Amino acid sequence: MKTVQRERRYVCGQTKQNAIYQEVEIYTVGTDKKSREREKEKSTPIPFRGKNPEKWDGHNAKRSRKWFCRLLATNFTEQDTHTSLTYSDEFLPKTEEQADRDINNFLRRLRTKCKAQSLPPPEAITVTEHQDADPETGQKAVRFHHHVILKCGLSRDDIESCWHRKKKPMGWANCDRLQLDKGSLEALANYLMKYPKRKHRWKRTKGIIDPILPRPNDSKYTRRGIQKIATDPAILHDRDFWAKKYPGWELIEAQAEHNEYWGWSIMLKMHRIPERRGRPYAC
């Protein structure tokens, strides 16, 4: 079967020019119909809307975490927040529909407060999670709760104050700034996805965009070149080497994996080097 060595980039930002983070995957891909279909699925962003797909484990879970990290890096910065919302016994919903109404009301109050303070509308990704008890398997119940990744000009106190019903707090609300240093995006994605058997419902507001996927490059690397890089740690983790390959970008992390069928693959995480002396960013 004929193969090519593909470079696929995931540029995380509103535009290619202002993006400050990107991931690069370098790997072997077949040119047959089945390989093309698999490649199309791999490069299709996960929407993170509605319920999780039925099969959300193994490879699918790994792929979901990667896309969630990219979605966060594309839309949020250290100025944005992660808010956890829980329920007291009095307000604990009995159905998913009620929990959905509660989070919609929370977002509506945020929009109202932003409008009153002449702030842009909030942008958010929300995750509602719960689990029913199952005596046969020993599975314990998990109460309804929500996670909200939020871009909003309101103070943290104002954000937390929106979690109420008829002016009465519905439970505990805790709002913290996002930490976007090394490994923190993965940690947050793992935290929100660590229980794949629980029921999840995702929501994203208008304004949340997917990462930018430039056209893949099938001529930049050779199979022998990928193997040489992957098997030599001095090259794999050499920032100067990758800076020449991707001008304007600085290596954060490099990983190499070997597959018995496809051979070596490389995954890079990179930050944009700050602009200097008025020179435009390279992309």
What are these regions, as identified by a protein language model?
Residues 1-142, 152-283:
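Right-hand nucleic-acid polymerase module
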